[in-house]
Amino acid sequence: MAGCGNQPPAPDWAVNAEAAAQRASTAYLQGQPRIESLQWQKARASVASTGRTDLAARMELIRCATQVASLEWDDCPTFQALQPDAAAPEQAYARYLNARPRAGDAGLLPKEQQAAARHIAAQAASAPLTAGEVRQMTGAGDPLSRLLAAAVLLRAGNASPELLQAGVDLASAQGWRRALMAWLLLQAKAAERMGDADMAAHIHRRLELLQK
């Protein structure tokens, strides 16, 4: 306990940036764009006060990770503008968000994402995941970390009913309306392709409820 007391407090900018980024991420997942935009402005302003482009790059990756978890996939252009100044862990994280991790990237990533990164980097070709593989690669960490791992695996071409259900369940349990709608829409398309009319109808009823 005495040792904890000797640690210097985090500077105000860092505390403010982290809090605003968390609020922005939650607002995005819940489908509250006005709050999301305001909080990202606060987070970016706090980081900008340091004049450090490497930290600004890290902040943009946090935003992009939330979008990836909600199945909004692009190349994270706001990070790309700062990419030359990003540190090695952030470079690896950006590749991971694009489902293109290199063989040595896993050790640079948050531990919750390492299993998925190793799987993607090692596989010769994309393949549906079994229930056990889904649990192994999406079962660690906080709900957003788990949803992100599922989304990156999906982006890498590892779609399976078990993976889609994991994404749906994670988003539903947190009440993340926007993320849940994205996962349900994909699950509905999969059910329709398989000719499972009952499943597709059930999913569409869930989507109708979300839109109320």
Indicate residue ranges for each PLM-predicted region.
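TPR repeat positional signature
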Residues: 20, 39, 55-56, 60, ...
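Structural register within alpha-helical repeat arrays
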Residues: 23-24, 43, 63, 148-153, ...
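Bacterial Sec signal peptide processing site at the extreme N-terminus
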Residues: 1-23
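Extended amphipathic alpha-helical interaction segments
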Residues: 89-176
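Hydrophobic/aromatic side-chain positions at a characteristic register within alpha-helices
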Residues: 9, 21, 28-31, 48, ...
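Alpha-helical linker/edge segments of TPR/alpha-solenoid repeat scaffolds
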Residues: 63-87, 100-109, 192-200
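Residues that mark the junctions of alpha-helical repeat units in TPR/alpha-solenoid scaffolds
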Residues: 9, 16, 35, 56, ...
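Short, charge-rich amphipathic alpha-helical segments embedded
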Residues: 43-73, 173-182, 192, 211
